[in-house]
């Protein structure tokens, strides 16, 4: 039977707030409150997904394995994540911590699971962000060579990127939102131009809807398409991390989440359908086999003009930068929250007095990125095949695991309290989402060789990093419970009251 959520025994009201207040002194004030609206937060999470990069760099691979029916894979992934968002957004109205996944999982599954989730989140977000420096390097190399015939070594580009992202993250969150807004409009705008050209011309064989027929959807490659499609939504769940900086977060966070999921699902499916129409259903597989990475550039040149293809090269680079900035901001806020919880070093909880950004956490994350980029460069690694794919693989799997755990946590949390959210939001949608997220994760793991091109042993290590991180977090929680019981007792507390958590 559900029970009222009540203050925990021995935890005074405002305990978490007092701890954060201690960290937010005159020397290190708090994050800027009520600065972000729905559009700002949506820009952050959509930018993290890097729509143009996903379309130009990954969608051709999805078409290659799934054929003409590939657009449906993106619709199905979007629908599954929208189902996840139902319970996720319901929980954001009850859990006011800005700790994101680890706070939600703590509320529903207990502190040991919450510590494990926090460790996985740090692994996953850092893996995604740092790995993409390899993509930034190769994307910039391609643009420089295509436009001006200049070759620059990839480590120089990646290291420059680390400093650029650090500077953008160091500035205020409003500044970052404006930068991401401009970059997102640029990358989506070029795809809209391509779509307009194809629609006005009628495509290579006339516009057709055969991508959505059962014969083209129910094919052996559909599972692989879904694996690519789920990976394309990475980062949408980070809306909750910006809770402390959002205006009216009870409304802003859910709206931004639904907008991000809805936009990405529809936009991805539409753009994949458009590029299929550009070559025609009978010729698209030949085009993908001949030049998969040039698919969108060739279509843009034919239907819009060479100038637009040149712009696409540039906007892919800015798309990658936008994605990295979004992940950098998310990591910094995870670090800030965990430092203010007393789990990470206190210095990471400092906020810049003027920009109100978690600048120390940003410096730490940038140093970590610099170390990994330099290490891969000194080892003679390939920036795409190794830096990108090896770092992104545990990152993507980790985020999917956190989504599955969060869906279960939603169900467990609402079983314990009285609420008026309804069975759809608290029972049916969360449990269905948990099954779908677990299934999606299994699809990705089962197709991991296709996605990385690495041998079995390498793939096994990359996949096992995720459960290893979770176990490490659980072990840390047990140590903290023994050595620092006050920190353990208030882990993932609400910012204003010590609400009861599971376990």
Where in this protein do the model-derived segments appear?
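Membrane-interface "cap" regions at the ends of multi-pass membrane proteins
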Residues: 1-59, 63-69, 82, 206-213, ...
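Transmembrane helix-boundary motif of multi-pass solute transporters/channels
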Residues: 23-142, 239, 446-453, 461-464
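Helix-loop-helix junctions that connect adjacent transmembrane segments
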Residues: 27-32, 70-71, 147-153, 181-313
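Membrane-helix boundary/coupling elements in multi-pass transport proteins
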Residues: 97, 120-135, 238-245, 306-346, ...
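TM-loop-TM module centered on a large, flexible mid-protein loop between adjacent transmembrane helices
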Residues: 103-104, 110, 142-146, 262-327, ...
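Helix-loop-helix connectors at the membrane interface of multi-pass transporters/channels
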Residues: 103-107, 134-154, 185, 243-249, ...
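Membrane-interface loop-to-helix entry segments
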Residues: 154-201, 256-265, 398-401, 416-435, ...
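A generic transmembrane alpha-helix motif of multi-pass inner-membrane proteins
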Residues: 394-402, 424-503
